[in-house]
A protein has these predicted regions:
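Short glycine/proline/serine/threonine-rich loop/turn segments at secondary-structure transition edges
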Residues: 108-116
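Short, hydrophobic beta-strand segments
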Residues: 100-109
Length: 141
């Protein structure tokens, strides 16, 4: 009986998960690497009149590794039928380097506007990270 208690005790102690969640120094920095940045820190998107929408890729760096779910939104939306549509896809996932990408698209009605893009996520330690950037929609043609 004593031997059985020792074996059960060792089994329970040996199978206990004593790992602690490592709270890395996660960050969130979003950018628009394909766009020119103005002197006031805003990005400039030149609208292409040959397309229904003009697209660009936005980037997010978290330094938190793979599989962080990021949520995106903008302060402007576009009405399609009866649905309001954001100018950015609502979600993306980070890769092994902690980097995520998402598409941003503007319609012609946004020429002259400055759109604020928001991105956020909550890391494994429960810390919420939020960042934003501004994109000016211009038509220089």
């Amino acid at each position: 009986m004593k031997r059985l208690l020792i074996i059960v005790g060792l089994f329970l102690i040996g199978c206990e998960d004593t790992r602690e969640v490592e709270c890395n120094e996660c960050i969130l920095e979003i950018s628009a690497s394909e766009l020119q940045e103005s002197t006031d820190g805003q990005y400039i998107l030149e609208y292409n009149q040959d397309l229904a929408q003009t697209y660009t890729m936005l980037d997010a760096t978290t330094e938190c590794g793979w599989s962080q779910h990021l949520q995106w939104d903008t302060d402007y939306q576009y009405l399609i039928g009866t649905d309001w549509v954001s100018l950015v896809n609502p979600g993306s996932m980070t890769d092994g380097d902690g980097v995520a990408h998402v598409m941003f698209a503007a319609w012609e009605v946004f020429i002259g506007d400055t759109i604020t893009v928001y991105c956020g996520y909550t890391d494994d330690c429960g810390v919420h990270h939020l960042d934003s950037l501004k994109i000016q929609i211009v038509d220089n043609e």
